[in-house]
Regions:
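Non-catalytic helical/linker scaffolds that mediate oligomerization, partner binding
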Residues: 2-207
Length: 207
């Protein structure tokens, strides 16, 4: 796969630059999972409208691609993930010729690779949905969580989410998951900023 050319696996075309270890992330199973989510949710995501697409220089785009691979292969895996908006597109990952939702890419790669492991360690995969103002988009995320649990054989409510109101600081990140699940997004509207916040919570994986 690390040829620097486009390659298609399970109906998904990778058009990013070749970077070390990307084969470990973009497996046939992971790409098939992304393709399934894309096929089931692309029409609803398109109805949200087109998200703004930042223009990058080639060197910046290559670094961004490397960062995408690196953060998904990081050890130990993150408890909290901050996916991009569903309406944004990932132009370097295509399904049937159409760019995938950047949100689906960020969510799907992390959940496929890490959800079972996180649960086995007594943690839960959290999606931090910062500034998601549309009710339609929030409902889409909830439906994505439920469908991902079904496809991956995860327990109901295994995927958790925090929905932050725009401009509201994170008060704490030591979530126990009691107030949120795949069906209920936790809305945190506390107006008081906190001096120190821990963006990563959970037990460190054993070496």
């Amino acid at each position: 796969m690390n040829t620097g050319h486009e390659v298609t696996i399970n109906g998904v075309t990778l058009a990013g630059p070749a970077v070390p270890r990307q084969n470990e992330l973009f497996t046939a199973e992971a790409l098939g999972f992304l393709a399934q989510l894309h096929k089931e949710f692309a029409a609803r995501i398109a109805a949200l409208g087109t998200g703004s697409q930042p223009r990058r220089e080639p060197a910046e785009a290559a670094a961004d691609w490397q960062a995408l691979v690196g953060r998904n292969l990081a050890e130990p895996p993150s408890t909290f993930v901050y996916p991009r908006r569903l309406a944004r597109t990932e132009e370097r990952i295509l399904c049937a010729g159409s760019p995938m939702s950047a949100g689906i890419v960020d969510f799907g790669l992390h959940i496929h690779r890490n959800a079972h492991r996180l649960l086995s360690e007594g943690r839960a995969p959290f999606m931090s949905l910062l500034g998601m103002e549309s009710e339609e988009e929030l409902q889409l995320w909830q439906d994505l969580f439920v469908r991902a649990e079904e496809l991956l054989g995860l327990p109901d409510g295994a995927i958790r989410a925090i929905h932050m109101q725009p401009g509201v600081p994170v008060e704490d990140e030591g979530e126990d998951g009691q107030a949120s699940s795949a069906a209920v997004l936790m809305v945190r509207t506390q107006p008081t900023p906190v001096v120190s916040a821990q963006p990563m919570a959970g037990v460190r994986a054993a070496a």
